[in-house]
Structure formats: C-alpha cells, structure tokens
Regions:
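Short Gly/Thr/Asp-enriched flexible loops that form oxyanion-binding sites at enzyme active sites
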Residues: 122-140
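Gly/Ser/Thr-enriched, mixed-charge loops and adjacent short helices
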Residues: 1-109
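Conserved phosphate-handling catalytic cores of large alpha/beta enzymes
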Residues: 148-152
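Active-site phosphate-binding/coordination module
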Residues: 1, 119, 130
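Gly/Ser/Thr-rich loops at beta-strand to alpha-helix junctions
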Residues: 56-61, 121-122, 163-164
C-alpha cells in the first residue's frame, strides 16, 4: 500500500505522543502559565479510593489511565481496546443514556468517581460516587468558582458559545 511504501522509503515516520504528553502534563506545561497540578495531593486524596475511566475505544485511550496510574490512583478501565466498530456501545459519546456502563461500573466497584471521554477525547462526562452524571456545562462553572474563590486565581476564562452562560 501507499503507507507501507512511504514508510519503507523514509517519507513517513510514526510516533507515539503518550510519553511526551504525560511528561509535559506532569511538568505542569513547562511554565506556560497553566494551573499547576499537584499530583501528591491527588495521590493523598485518592489513597483509599478508586476511579473508573471509560475510554470508549477511542484515540484518547491510555492517556488518563497513565496519568492517574502514575499519580498512584487505583482505577478500572472500560472500553480500552482500539476498535473502530465500538463493540458494546450504542453511541460513543459520554452523555446519558450512553454513559450507563460507566455509571454501573462506578456502582459495582464502589468507585469515588467515573470519567468518560468520547472517541476523539474532546468531550467528557463525570459520574460521582452516587451515580449522578455531570455534563461539562455543569463541571466547568464549579471549576471556575473553585479556582476563583478557593484558590484566589484571577484572569480570563475562555468559553465556547454553549458554555458562555454557565461560566460568566
């Protein structure tokens, strides 16, 4: 095929960004003014808790599990295999009713938190230990409030048109 030929001729090289991305996240973005991530605090908070991650067979698989694993957080993962046929999923979007397998696994394992992301990892959903599902439009205002009030951070918040009313 053309791809095989391009690789054989040295015109195309593949790479796995996972190691570099995880290192960048753990270094807090190399001083690019991101909010720092306190992995020790995450480790302490989750020391006796578990999380469930639903990767929806997508391209984001392995990233979040690697980060929480390196933070010392125990986790269970769903739909971790690369499979474009999306077996076991009616629709690969982390929203109700399609987040039901994540909600069930959180309840079954007694996990403290469930996190799901769609197949290209640009959408997410959160399930709390009581099985309540939170959309990004519910999570983002809570996060902005926490960062502004509890952490005393100031600055601008950039939001999409759909998020704007919930974070302003």
């Amino acid at each position: 095929t053309d791809l095989v030929d391009a690789r054989l001729r040295g015109r195309m090289h593949g790479f796995d960004p996972l190691d570099d991305y995880v290192a960048w996240i753990k270094s807090n973005g190399d001083g690019n003014a991101r909010i720092t991530i306190d992995f020790d605090r995450i480790r302490r908070f989750f020391c006796d808790k578990q999380v469930v991650i639903d990767e929806f067979h997508g391209s984001g698989r392995g990233y979040l599990t690697r980060l929480v694993g390196e933070a010392g957080v125990r986790y269970t993962v769903l739909h971790a295999q690369r499979d474009p046929d999306l077996p076991g999923l009616d629709y690969a979007n982390p929203e109700e009713p399609f987040i039901q397998p994540l909600k069930e696994k959180v309840a079954e394992t007694g996990a403290h938190l469930g996190m799901g992301m769609d197949t290209d990892a640009d959408r997410y959903g959160i399930v709390d230990k009581g099985g309540i599902f939170f959309r990004p439009n519910q999570i983002l205002p809570m996060l902005v409030r926490y960062l502004g009030i509890e952490r005393g951070l100031t600055g601008r918040v950039i939001a999409t048109q759909t998020d704007r009313k919930s974070v302003v």
